[in-house]
UniProtKB/Swiss-Prot annotation:
InterPro entries attached to this UniProt entry: Enolase-ppase_E1, HAD-like_sf, HAD-SF_hydro_IA, HAD_sf
Enzyme's top EC category: hydrolase
EC number(s) stated in the UniProt entry for this protein: 3.1.3.77
Subunit structure: Monomer.
GO biological process: L-methionine salvage from methylthioadenosine
Name of the coding gene: mtnC
GO molecular function: 2,3-diketo-5-methylthiopentyl-1-phosphate enolase activity; 2-hydroxy-3-keto-5-methylthiopentenyl-1-phosphate phosphatase activity; acireductone synthase activity; magnesium ion binding
Protein's name according to its UniProt entry: Enolase-phosphatase E1
Family: Belongs to the HAD-like hydrolase superfamily. MasA/MtnC family.
Family annotation (SUPFAM superfamilies): HAD-like
Length: 232
């Protein structure tokens, strides 16, 4: 696999550990939700998302009901766009207050910097909201890496397991699918990307997946333990 024209990467389990997201970010947002909803429910950036949650779930528009729904979604790792938007707003204060810094694997940091230096456009596609993605890379333990990226995509462009989402991303960045490499730890996402012609790499880190994965469709993708093994 030669140097691609563009690289699209996932975050959780790919550039960064699953444990940081599940053991630090998710619990932080869960704890903060009651106060956040009470204090910001009328804010113009917050109200549309709360309205969406209430309308889609038939939940009475009360603080308690909304918080309970959102906390349940956190517990079940829902990828709902409204939840991700609200989580991103909550994490803003956590990053700014120094309550935590984002984890990045050293091999990912090294390769991201090298690709940027080689003028390869880098993009993020994550279920987390675009503002949350930008916060993540701006407040990482490796420093502010947000400037390495040329663009950001979240589920407002479509679900990560839907091939049409990757078609939209390719059209947005103006590069044919065959010129893009997508890096992820989720096989279903890689299958969707491969379906429309993206080159795909399964990142199968031992820190996140102690037993190497040899599941259905694994062999459809380049299967590596880390960014250090990438051939470009």
């Amino acid at each position: 696999m030669s140097m691609p024209q563009a690289i699209l990467t996932d975050i959780e389990g790919t550039t960064s550990s699953l444990s940081f997201v599940k053991e630090v970010l998710f619990p932080y947002a869960r704890r903060a939700l009651p106060d956040f909803v009470r204090e910001h429910r009328e804010h113009p950036d917050v109200m549309p998302w709360l309205d969406q949650v209430a309308n889609e779930t038939g939940t009475a528009f009360s603080e308690e009901a909304l918080v309970a729904t959102l906390q349940t979604w956190i517990d079940t790792d829902s990828k709902h766009t409204a939840l991700k938007a609200l989580q991103g707003m909550i994490w803003t204060s956590g990053y700014q207050n120094g309550d935590f810094t984002a984890h990045l694997y050293p091999d990912a940091v090294q390769r991201l910097r090298a690709w940027h230096a080689a003028n390869v456009p880098l993009y993020v596609y994550s279920s987390g909201s675009v503002p949350a993605q930008q916060l993540f890379f701006r407040h990482s333990h490796a420093g502010d890496l947000s400037g390495l990226f040329s663009g950001w995509f979240d589920t407002q462009i479509g679900g990560k397991r839907e091939s049409t989402s990757y078609q939209r991303i390719a059209q947005h960045i103006g590069i044919a699918p065959a010129g893009i490499v997508f890096l992820s730890d989720v096989i279903e996402e890689l299958n969707a990307a491969a379906q429309i012609g993206l080159n795909t790499v399964l990142i199968d880190r031992r820190d996140d997946y102690p037993t190497p994965r040899h599941l259905k469709d694994t062999d459809r993708h380049l299967h590596l333990d880390s960014f250090a093994q990438l051939p470009f």
